[in-house]
């Protein structure tokens, strides 16, 4: 395609990419990222796909997500909530944080069925519905990343400042922290919404998710800053671990809690990185003069790419229960006891016990003993 001609459209309604070349005031970084993301750029696989082919690929990926990941996320997060609440008297501080994280994940997983089959991006053309869905998703996205950030900081206090901060690391303060995190998540969403809504009330196709200031805030407050804090916490934790091994060693319980939280943070980073890179590339592109707000939406500009990064982000909420089940020793013990209590028939009890023992190989006799060593 000649560099002086505008990007071609594929199909009837889907706009595949911005006009190229970009305006003269664009930065080299924005130009390179724009070309890299273009769905009709050389080397980009989606550039040669028709509208129907992109729809089929998106539908196939949505079906894979619904068949394999959605049941794990939906049932797994419910189990985390039900089992831990059933044994609330034996709940540790990390368990309390994971319960709140599971609540946020469960809401995201339930909402994901609407998102993953929104293949034509139709509800993004309805201003009220688009704004409502965006508010709903952002609150739970912020709560997830805020809980992960606070859990990393809590691990640092438990390992490096145990003597100094022991009086403050109580269940009462943990519950108070959870309430403040939920309030911060709601505020981080509603305050910008109120501000931008007053400026865009006259726009027929206004959607909260498409406002550039909101997108910058989402990338900065929901990804860059939290992971900078998490990285700092884990660097300090590593230093504390090295010192602990030199002197007296580290309690196995705390090692396992640290390993589980690190795994959750790593999976969150991998799943949400594509979404934030996608939004950042869109933000670095200069708005074309005369473009309507609807056409500026990156969801309309790159439908297949946007659908893929959405699926990756939702996958995080489905994978957390797996991490919690396989790395959370206390939860495995609680799950065994919960199943044994709820299965009254002897044959069914033996079957469930054997199944759990095969899936989670660990001796059940040690379950009650391990409950006593709370973090």
From Swiss-Prot:
Induction: Up-regulated during adipogenesis. InterPro entries: GPCR_Rhodpsn (IPR000276), GPCR_Rhodpsn_7TM (IPR017452), GPER1-like (IPR047143). Expressed in brain, heart, spleen, preadipocytes, mature adipocytes and primary hippocampal neurons. Expressed in neurons of the hippocampus, hypothalamic paraventricular nucleus (PVH), supraoptic nucleus (SON) and the median eminence. Expressed in the nucleus ambiguous (at protein level). Expressed in brain, pituitary gland, adrenal medulla, renal pelvis, ovary, endothelial cells, visceral fat tissues and islets of Langerhans. Glycans are attached at residues 32, 44. GO terms for cellular component: axon; axon terminus; cytoplasm; cytoplasmic vesicle membrane; cytosol; dendrite; dendritic shaft; dendritic spine head. Disulfide bonds join 130-207. Changing residue 375 to A: Loss of interaction with DLG4. The modification N-acetylmethionine is found at residue 1. Its main location: nucleus. Keywords: Acetylation, Apoptosis, Cell cycle, Cell membrane, Cell projection, Cytoplasm, Cytoplasmic vesicle, Cytoskeleton, Differentiation, Disulfide bond, Endoplasmic reticulum, Endosome, G-protein coupled receptor, Glycoprotein, Golgi apparatus, Immunity, Inflammatory response, Innate immunity, Membrane, Mitochondrion, Neurogenesis, Nucleus, Postsynaptic cell membrane, Receptor, Synapse, Transducer, Transmembrane, Transmembrane helix, Ubl conjugation. Interacts with RAMP3; the interaction confers proper subcellular localization and function in cardioprotection. Interacts with KRT7 and KRT8. Interacts with EGFR; the interaction increases after agonist-induced stimulation in cancer-associated fibroblasts (CAF). Interacts with EGFR and ESR1. Interacts (via C-terminus tail motif) with DLG4 (via N-terminus tandem pair of PDZ domains); the interaction is direct and induces the increase of GPER1 protein levels residing at the plasma membrane surface in a estradiol-independent manner. Homodimer. G-protein coupled estrogen receptor that binds to 17-beta-estradiol (E2) with high affinity, leading to rapid and transient activation of numerous intracellular signaling pathways. Stimulates cAMP production, calcium mobilization and tyrosine kinase Src inducing the release of heparin-bound epidermal growth factor (HB-EGF) and subsequent transactivation of the epidermal growth factor receptor (EGFR), activating downstream signaling pathways such as PI3K/Akt and ERK/MAPK. This is G-protein coupled estrogen receptor 1. It comes from Mus musculus. The lineage of its organism: Eukaryota, Metazoa, Chordata, Craniata, Vertebrata.
């Amino acid at each position: 395609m000649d560099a002086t001609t505008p990007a071609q459209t594929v199909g009837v309604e889907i706009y595949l990419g911005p006009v190229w070349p970009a305006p003269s005031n664009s930065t080299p970084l924005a130009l390179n990222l724009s070309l890299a993301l273009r769905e009709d750029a050389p080397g980009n696989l989606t550039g040669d796909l028709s509208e129907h082919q992109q729809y089929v690929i998106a539908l196939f990926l949505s079906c894979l997500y619904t068949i394999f990941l959605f049941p794990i996320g939906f049932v797994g997060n419910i189990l985390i909530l039900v089992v831990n609440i059933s044994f609330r008297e034996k709940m540790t501080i990390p368990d309390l944080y994971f319960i709140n994280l599971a609540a946020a994940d469960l809401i995201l997983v339930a909402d994901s069925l609407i998102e993953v089959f929104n293949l034509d991006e139709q509800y993004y053309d309805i201003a009220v519905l688009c704004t409502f869905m965006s508010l709903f998703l952002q609150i739970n996205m912020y709560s997830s990343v805020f809980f992960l950030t606070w859990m990393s900081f809590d691990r640092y206090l438990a390992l490096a400042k145990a003597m100094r901060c022991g009086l403050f690391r109580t269940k009462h303060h943990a519950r108070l922290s959870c309430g403040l995190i939920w309030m911060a998540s709601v505020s981080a969403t509603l305050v910008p919404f109120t501000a931008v809504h007053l400026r865009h009330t006259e726009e027929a196709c206004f959607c909260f998710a498409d406002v550039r200031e909101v997108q910058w805030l989402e990338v900065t407050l929901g990804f860059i800053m939290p992971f900078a804090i998490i990285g700092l916490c884990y660097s300090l934790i590593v230093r504390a671990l090295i010192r602990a091994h030199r002197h007296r060693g580290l309690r196995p319980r705390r090692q396992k809690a640290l390993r589980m939280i690190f795994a959750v943070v790593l999976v969150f980073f991998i799943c949400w990185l594509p979404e934030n890179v996608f939004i950042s590339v869109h933000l670095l592109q200069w708005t074309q003069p005369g473009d309507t707000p609807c056409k500026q939406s990156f969801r309309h500009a790159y439908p297949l790419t946007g659908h893929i990064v959405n699926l990756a982000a939702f996958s995080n909420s489905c994978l957390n229960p797996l991490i919690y089940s396989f790395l959370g020793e206390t939860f495995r013990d609680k799950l065994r006891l919960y199943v044994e209590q709820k299965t009254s028939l002897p044959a069914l009890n033996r079957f469930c016990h054997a199944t759990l023992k095969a899936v989670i190989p660990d001796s059940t006799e040690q379950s009650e003993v391990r409950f006593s060593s709370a973090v």
